[in-house]
Amino acid sequence: MVRCRVRSPSERSHEVYRQQLHGQEQGHHGQEEQGLSPEHVEVYERTHGHSHYRRRHCSRRRLRRIHRQQHRSCRRRKRRSCRHRRRHRKGCRTRRRTCRRH
């Protein structure tokens, strides 16, 4: 599938910023005070909407969850296997001990 090149949000925001500067020079101070135009809102959503999403990856809560999952995942698997296969309970207990060392 071929896609045409779309400008990145950063390129677009610079272009809008330039337009605002030129508008102020010509004497259009009222438009900026009233609020964002539809075009500016679109740019604002693109540039600022994803910034929160990107920050989320580095949050301590998320890192802690990932860290916990690494340690608990093997224990969870063993517990589930025990529930389904009741015959092998003794083998599962010995496996759990080796699992906790990690």
From Swiss-Prot:
Residues 1-102 are annotated as: Disordered. GO terms for molecular function: DNA binding. Keywords: Chromosome, Developmental protein, Differentiation, DNA condensation, DNA-binding, Nucleosome core, Nucleus, Phosphoprotein, Spermatogenesis. Testis. It is found in: Nucleus; Chromosome. Residues 49-102 have a biased composition (Basic residues). GO terms for biological process: chromosome condensation; nucleus organization; spermatid development; spermatogenesis. Residues 8-17, 39-48 have a biased composition (Basic and acidic residues). Proteolytic processing into mature chains is required for histone eviction during spermatogenesis. Transition proteins (TNP1 and TNP2) are required for processing. InterPro entries: PRM2. The modification Phosphoserine is found at S8, S10, S37. Coiled coil: none annotated. Belongs to the protamine P2 family. Interacts with TDRP. This is Protamine-2.
